[in-house]
């Protein structure tokens, strides 16, 4: 945000392990100590021992509960009386709104125009006044800063605040005290503005420096990776990602400095890789993760890091995903796996042609989900008609087998899968 308070180590000291332990004492009774579980299926798939830290089990569905509560508990009676304001794509908004409601503090939240409806409605449900402004979190932040000055509200920064960072770092405490995390080699953590990874990295590196801390960003918005390459926070241009919770134009100064000191590596993942990771978590582990929450699995699955045969923990940072987006992800993921196929078959335009084609498909044990005639808009020559078929299939080899059988029977068949 162009007008955000510039938090640097010259005016505010770097946080320490002691700050994180103090934060844990403050918030422990009011946040969920989230499950840390071993995944046999994902371990087999990834070639290493995979642990999952499930922050989607927090009350508002993400790790943001921790930092938001720690920051709110620091407010003076006067600040509580006037209220707070925050800017967020959803998770920080919900966390601030929920804990403000619990603590009796008035809250106002500015969210980007494209924020998933589920996050907007949830934030309003916690009693916050929601204002939609701008295309990204940074844009919403400019209005939030302005309103904080005009109305005397305390601005609760989503990531560039030591108390927020210390709250997020309490995840590190829960990781290292869990017996499953003994001999842990690495922790993979999503990066947006950098609040989560800077907190976790501080605690882990000051407690057990041997544990590698690896950040994961969406390829579409690699703000931390770009900043580390340049040696200072870099502002990216307009962007969007399935991982909307980490689509941040610029990381915070304090977050950048902590990452420089403690983060071993930052990698990026593509949109299709994120979508596939969301689908695998849902299908294999029955875990609903948002795009930002699944980037860690996407990185491990696609061998972005060399951790074969090691014990690796993935922070699943949140599960607040729009149902419509989840539906699209499921469809796209099934198509990528060859479990849904869409093809166009050109038939002679007389009775029985479609039946003949469908009998071939039936014989190859594909399930027909949808049949659509294109009689009027078709470019087929006179005497022919194009029919689009959506099929449930058993993999890419099965799709090729169906296409070959149709072509062998004289049908022109074209793969039209565009999910």
Q: Which ranges hold each PLM region?
A:
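PLP-dependent amino-acid enzyme catalytic core
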Residues: 10-419
């Amino acid at each position: 945000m162009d007008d955000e308070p510039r938090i640097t180590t010259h005016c505010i000291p770097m946080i320490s392990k002691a700050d994180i332990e103090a934060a844990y004492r403050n918030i422990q009774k009011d946040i969920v100590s989230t499950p840390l579980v071993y995944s046999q299926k994902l371990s087999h798939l990834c070639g290493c021992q995979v642990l999952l830290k499930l922050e989607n089990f927090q009350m508002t569905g993400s790790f943001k509960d921790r930092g938001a509560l720690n920051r709110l508990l620091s407010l003076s009676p006067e600040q509580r009386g006037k209220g707070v304001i925050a800017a967020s794509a959803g998770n920080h908004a919900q966390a601030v709104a929920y804990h403000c409601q619990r603590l009796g503090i008035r809250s106002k939240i500015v969210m980007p125009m494209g924020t998933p409806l589920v996050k907007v409605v949830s934030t309003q449900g916690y009693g916050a006044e929601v204002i939609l402004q701008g295309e990204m979190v940074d844009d919403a932040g400019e209005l939030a800063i302005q309103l904080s000055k005009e109305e005397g509200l305390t601005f609760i920064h989503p990531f560039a605040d030591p108390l927020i960072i210390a709250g997020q770092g309490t995840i590190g405490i829960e990781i290292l005290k869990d017996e499953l995390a003994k001999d842990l080699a690495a922790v993979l953590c999503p990066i947006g503005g950098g609040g989560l990874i800077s907190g976790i990295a501080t605690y882990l590196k000051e407690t057990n420096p041997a544990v590698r801390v690896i950040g994961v960003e969406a390829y579409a918005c690699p703000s931390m990776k770009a900043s580390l390459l340049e040696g200072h926070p870099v502002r990216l241009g307009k962007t969007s990602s399935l991982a909307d919770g980490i689509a941040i134009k610029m990381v915070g100064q304090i977050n950048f400095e902590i990452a420089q000191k403690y983060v071993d590596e930052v990698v990026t993942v593509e949109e299709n890789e994120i979508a596939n990771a969301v689908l695998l978590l849902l299908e294999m582990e029955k875990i609903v993760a948002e795009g930002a929450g699944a980037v860690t699995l996407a990185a491990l699955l696609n061998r972005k890091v060399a951790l074969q045969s090691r014990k690796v923990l993935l922070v699943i940072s949140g599960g607040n995903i729009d149902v419509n987006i989840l539906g699209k992800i499921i469809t796209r993921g099934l198509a990528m796996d060859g479990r849904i196929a869409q093809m166009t078959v050109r038939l002679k335009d007389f009775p029985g042609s479609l039946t003949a084609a469908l009998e071939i498909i039936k014989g190859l044990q594909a399930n027909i989900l949808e049949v659509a005639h294109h009689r009027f808009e078709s470019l087929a020559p006179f005497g022919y008609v194009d029919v689009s078929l959506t099929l449930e299939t058993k993999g890419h080899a099965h799709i090729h087998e169906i296409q070959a059988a149709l072509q062998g029977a004289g049908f022109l068949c074209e793969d039209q899968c565009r999910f």
